[in-house]
Regions:
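Non-catalytic interaction surface on structured domains
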Residues: 27-30, 36, 52, 58, ...
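Short alpha-helical segments that sit at the start of domains
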Residues: 4-38
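Short, cationic-aromatic polyanion-contact patches
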Residues: 83-95
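Residue-level marker of regulatory loop/turn positions in helix-turn-helix DNA-binding domains and
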Residues: 24-25, 43, 61
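A short, conserved structural fragment
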Residues: 73-83
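Short amphipathic alpha-helical interaction segments
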Residues: 59-74
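Short acidic, hydrophobic short linear motifs in intrinsically disordered regions
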Residues: 42-56
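Intrinsically disordered, low-complexity regulatory regions
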Residues: 1-2, 77, 91
Length: 95
């Protein structure tokens, strides 16, 4: 991959994030959303255990992981899954 191709990919990613409304989120929040998108099932549900092991968020410290998870819940991106186990969540906003 050459330098120009890499720069074009970065520009395309920025444009896609802008189009989806996530470009203004801090980096860790965006990374966790990528992790959520990677682990959700057909009903848009996921467990925090699945997410914690995901490549996008596995580098987060324990405290950062829980802080960002709580922030995404409070901002309405994800929520606790109704009628499911305590560590089950659901993606609320659609992409």
């Amino acid at each position: 991959m050459n330098r120009k191709m890499l720069l074009n990919l970065k520009l395309a990613l920025r444009q896609a994030e802008t189009d989806l409304g996530i470009s203004n989120l801090p980096e860790f929040e965006r990374e966790m959303l990528y992790g959520v998108l990677d682990v959700i099932d057909d009903e848009k549900a996921f467990s925090s255990d699945q997410l914690r092991k995901n490549t996008y968020v596995s580098r987060f410290t324990h405290a950062t992981y829980h802080r960002i998870l709580a922030k995404l819940v409070s901002d309405g991106w994800i929520g606790k899954a109704q009628g499911r186990v305590r560590n089950e969540y659901k993606l609320l906003k659609t992409f």
